């Protein structure tokens, strides 16, 4: 019985690993750092104009 529980636990971490890259991308998209860099580029463009 204990072996069955281990087998059930093994596929779970693999699924988590598959979800991690997607979660990381979502986190990167939600990070305000990109928004700040975009605003900085806009400010520089405004100064150049």
UniProtKB/Swiss-Prot annotation:
Residues 9-18 have a biased composition (Basic and acidic residues). Residues 1-49 are annotated as: Disordered. This is Uncharacterized protein DDB_G0268274. It comes from Dictyostelium discoideum.
